[in-house]
């Protein structure tokens, strides 16, 4: 590969004036610092840091655990974390077309006490910058801004909650770190020194961090004389006043680093100055090679003058391993010398940001109506998976800015007039402001948006006349129904089709309005009378049902569900799921989809399939149960849909899926450690205990298993899927005779044999679940000598072999006493006699003792460990450094 270099020497008479204390254009943000606290100067650097409260619309503040405080600088002590939403963004005012050094610092410091390391994505605008997966890292990038605003976004990708400690921006000269294309992502930056001192501002006017780099095969060279540093790169005097040469004069001076993936392109910057006084008969001359190929030279450094050897085109290393060598020439009497080196990988940000006018327009709309939707952060249109709720965009080419084509703010609680900010959305095709409380007149500027095809203003409190320009606009559909004060005073509210026939567009006669209101009042009175006569009591016994041959119930015989929760129409379900766009999973009931209620509340929508083995009876059972049970460890019901053949249950959204996914590793690459597993089963047990003891009459779940333990964004466990649940209808009743239902492997043998259902049937199933989290093995495995997990564990226990029982991925990182107690508890739950099984109250008590025993060993383990082993060299508060050879 051909490589080109430029030589920059500072032997010119003009020396650039370094203003060490100048922070002009610097943005230094202490994330998590209270808005009430004044800006402060950091003791080590003198840099002025301010609170982030005005730069971000979401998140909560935190602080590192006390044991970490002595290890970090003041700006790193606090942080902001984001438990809500998927994307949370900082909005920064910058100068367009300016070269910026951007640094984001992430130090976990066990701020939440959970010992769960980070794993989330970092975006600049709509483009992925990097993935944060280390407990302690500084991400750095050099880029040229495209506009006067910059958004730094933290995007949740799994179970860990995004956080950030510090955000810093430093403007740089345009002729620094020039690339053919793309931006420069920091790989390493080192100065050749055997000290442990890190160098940054004020020594470095751009606040670059220089880390010492040295090898035992080198000799340290220093000078007290002033070294003229590079005009272009303005290197610190303290960096260029030190260098190294090989101890053996004929040896090469090597710097080694790796890049991933191996095809990654990079730029290197080698900084050299002669800082030794050479005698008349001494010569220092060398070449520079990369992986054995000549790249620059021969070169003789000039005394006390800095030269920077810079790549003009990006390089690449075979296999991703790079070895830069400074090699003495035959002519040279002295060994090669090196002062400092930097390297960056090339990162492309191909996705253009949304059209600037559209962004300004939608933000003005947001500000006018005070919309605080959690998803309305970052770029409105891209990336597509983070599209703002209620918008549709056109993004035909990543090199062209996306445009907003549809805005749906229906049922969003809007008040006031229709804002003129909408007219800035000049590419809008569909505008839906229906079912709000908008007042004032229909504005004429809507007719000026040439692209508009559909305007839905129905269900508001608008008044006055519809502008003729709107009525006369060809090809546009206008709906203003449900606005009783709109009148057509400027001629007929009729617009002509292109074929010349007339069609009513808006008809709101006063007489019709009065008649409609009268009919509605009459219907409402009749409905209330009938409801009073026919409504069954929620707490009463369920009525008997006539079963149809296909397992579903004749709809005519099914009583209505009485609920204070919200009942949704099927069309609302379609809207909330964005036409069933995102599938969360599939069960016996049917498909489960992701959705939003009121534009902000995430929900999971379970749709009953017509081919489902579960029918209306189970649907109704689940709704009626969830209406009368409320517990932090039971999944909450947001609402339901019961419209014709369309049945749906709308639950609170559980962002981290089910326990089975995490145990099997299909959800992500993290493994739950023993303490986290205990916490999850304790919370699940508390939910069951509430069903057994907190409900009147008591409830039996009948289908306790790992797929029915759901985890929210805070990793709190909640019991789900109550379609098979049954209650004891008579006070004091100890069992109920039922048709056997449940999941094979989890099913209580006594219940299966007798058809007698008790709370102890749930206890048996919970014991199986407990063995699953202990062993991480299948409940039924025909390859084992004893296929059923309970029998297999029993055999292993007779041998005293608990190591073979435990999940090997835990790497024996647990308290043995805690484990033994949990295993014994699980086996007691599996007793063939239900009378000898513990109650769920006893189970909760014993599990808490297990957790206390685990916590007492000093918290030596992390809650989650990576399955993959990544070999990196890290020190607290630093980045990955290259190896000196």
UniProtKB/Swiss-Prot annotation:
Phosphothreonine PTM positions read 738, 743
Matching InterPro entries, A to Z?
Answer: Kinase-like_dom_sf, Leu-rich_rpt, LRR_dom_sf, Malectin-like_Carb-bd_dom, Prot_kinase_dom, Protein_kinase_ATP_BS, Ser/Thr_kinase_AS
Write out the topological domains of type Cytoplasmic.
Answer: 531-885
Similarity comment: Belongs to the protein kinase superfamily. Ser/Thr protein kinase family.
Q: Where in the cell is it found?
A: Membrane
* Lineage, broadest ranks: Eukaryota, Viridiplantae, Streptophyta, Embryophyta, Tracheophyta
User: What are its E.C. numbers?
Assistant: 2.7.11.1
Q: Which reaction does it catalyse?
A: L-seryl-[protein] + ATP = O-phospho-L-seryl-[protein] + ADP + H(+); L-threonyl-[protein] + ATP = O-phospho-L-threonyl-[protein] + ADP + H(+)
- Which GO molecular function, any one, fits this protein according to its record? ATP binding
Give the main EC class: transferase
Name recorded for this polypeptide:
Probable LRR receptor-like serine/threonine-protein kinase At1g51820
Q: Please tell me the species this chain comes from.
A: Arabidopsis thaliana (Mouse-ear cress)
- A cellular component term (GO) from this record? membrane
Q: Cite the SMART domains for this sequence.
A: S_TKc
**What topology does the record note for this protein and the membrane?**
Single-pass type I membrane protein
Start and end residues of each Protein kinase domain = 578-851
Report each LRR repeat as a residue range: 403-424, 427-447, 451-473
């Amino acid at each position: 590969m051909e490589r080109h270099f430029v030589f920059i020497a500072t032997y010119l008479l003009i020396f650039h004036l370094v203003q060490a204390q100048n922070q002009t254009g610097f943005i230094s943000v202490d994330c998590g610092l209270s808005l009430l606290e004044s800006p402060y100067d950091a003791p080590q650097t003198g840099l002025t840091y301010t609170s982030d409260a005005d730069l971000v619309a979401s998140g909560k503040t935190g602080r590192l655990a006390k044991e970490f405080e002595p290890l970090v600088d003041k700006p790193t002590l606090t942080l902001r974390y984001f438990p809500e939403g998927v994307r949370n963004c900082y909005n920064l005012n910058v100068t367009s077309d300016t070269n910026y050094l951007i640094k984001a610092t992430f130090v976990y410091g066990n701020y939440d006490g959970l010992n769960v390391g980070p794993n989330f994505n970092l975006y600049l605008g709509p483009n992925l910058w990097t993935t944060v997966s280390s407990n302690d890292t500084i991400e750095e990038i050099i880029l040229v801004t495209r506009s006067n605003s910059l958004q730094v976004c933290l995007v949740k990708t799994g179970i860990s909650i995004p956080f950030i400690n510090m955000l810093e921006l430093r403007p740089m000269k345009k002729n620094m770190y020039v690339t053919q294309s793309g931006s420069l992502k920091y790989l390493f930056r080192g100065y050749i020194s055997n000290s442990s001192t890190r160098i940054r501002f004020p020594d470095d006017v751009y606040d670059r961090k220089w880390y010492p780099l040295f090898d035992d095969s080198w000799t340290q060279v220093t000078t007290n004389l002033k070294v003229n540093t590079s005009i272009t790169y303005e290197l610190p005097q303290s960096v260029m006043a030190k260098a190294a040469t090989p101890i053996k004069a004929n040896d090469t001076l090597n710097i080694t680093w790796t890049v991933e993936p191996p095809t990654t392109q990079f730029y290197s910057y080698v900084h050299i100055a002669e800082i030794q006084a050479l005698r008349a008969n001494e010569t220092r001359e060398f070449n520079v090679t990369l992986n054995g190929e000549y790249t620059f030279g021969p070169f003789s450094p000039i005394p006390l003058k800095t030269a920077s050897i810079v790549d003009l085109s990006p390089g690449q290393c075979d296999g991703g391993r790079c070895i830069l060598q400074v090699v003495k020439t035959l002519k040279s009497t002295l060994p090669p010398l090196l002062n400092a080196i930097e390297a960056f990988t090339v990162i492309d940000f191909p996705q253009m940001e949304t059209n600037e006018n559209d962004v300004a327009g939608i933000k003005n709309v947001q500000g006018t109506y005070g919309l605080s939707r959690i998803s309305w952060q970052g770029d409105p249109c891209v990336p597509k998976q983070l599209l703002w709720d209620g918008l549709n965009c056109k993004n035909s080419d990543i090199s062209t800015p996306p445009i907003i084509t549809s805005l749906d703010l229906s049922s969003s609680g809007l008040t006031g007039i229709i804002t003129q900010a909408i007219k800035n959305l000049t590419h809008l095709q569909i505008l839906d402001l229906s079912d709000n409380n908008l007042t004032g007149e229909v504005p004429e500027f809507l007719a000026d948006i040439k692209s508009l095809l559909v305007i839905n203003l129905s269900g508001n409190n608008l008044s006055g006349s519809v502008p003729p320009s709107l009525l006369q606009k060809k090809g546009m559909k206008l709906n203003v129904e449900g606005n009783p004060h709109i009148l057509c005073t400027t001629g007929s509210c009729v617009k002509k089709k292109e074929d010349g026939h007339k069609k009513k567009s808006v008809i709101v006669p006063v007489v019709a309005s009065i008649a409609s209101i009268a009919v509605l009042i009459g219907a409402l009175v009749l409905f209330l009378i009938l409801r009073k006569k026919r409504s069954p009591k929620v707490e009463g016994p369920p009525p008997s049902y006539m079963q149809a041959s296909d397992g579903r119930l004749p709809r005519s015989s099914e009583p209505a569900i009485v609920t204070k929760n919200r009942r949704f129409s099927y069309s609302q379900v379609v809207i909330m799921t964005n036409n069933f766009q995102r599938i969360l999973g599939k069960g016996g009931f049917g498909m489960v989809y992701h959705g939003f209620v009121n534009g902000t509340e995430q929900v999971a929508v379970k749709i009953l399939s017509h081919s489902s083995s579960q029918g209306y009876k189970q649907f109704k059972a689940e709704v009626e149960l969830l209406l009368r049970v409320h517990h932090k460890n039971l999944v909450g019901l947001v609402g339901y849909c019961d419209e014709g053949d369309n049945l749906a249950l709308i639950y609170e959204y559980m962002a981290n899926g089910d326990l089975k996914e995490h145990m099997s590793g299909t959800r992500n690459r993290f493994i739950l450690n023993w303490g986290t597993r205990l916490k999850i089963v304790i919370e699940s047990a508390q939910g069951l205990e509430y069903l057994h003891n907190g409900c009147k009459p008591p409830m039996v779940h009948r289908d306790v298993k790992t797929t029915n333990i759901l985890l929210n964004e805070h990793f709190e466990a909640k019991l789900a899927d109550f379609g098979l649940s049954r209650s004891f209808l008579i006070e004091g009743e100890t069992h109920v005779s039922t048709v056997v239902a449940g999941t094979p492997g989890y099913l209580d043998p006594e219940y299966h044999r007798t058809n007698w259902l008790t709370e102890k049937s749930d206890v048996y199933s919970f014991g199986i679940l407990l063995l699953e989290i202990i062993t991480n093995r299948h409940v039924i495995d025909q390859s084992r000598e004893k296929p059923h997990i309970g029998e297999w564990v029993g055999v292993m226990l007779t041998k005293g072999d608990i190591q073979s029982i435990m999940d090997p991925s835990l790497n024996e990182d647990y308290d043995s006493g805690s484990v033994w107690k949990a295993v014994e508890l699980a086996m007691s739950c599996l007793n063939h006699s239900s009378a000898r099984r513990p109650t769920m109250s006893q189970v909760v008590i014993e599990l808490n003792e297990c957790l206390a025993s685990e916590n007492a060993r000093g918290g030596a383990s992390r809650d989650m460990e990576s399955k993959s082993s990544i070999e990196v060299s890290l020190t607290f508060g630093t980045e990955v450094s290259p190896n000196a050879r």
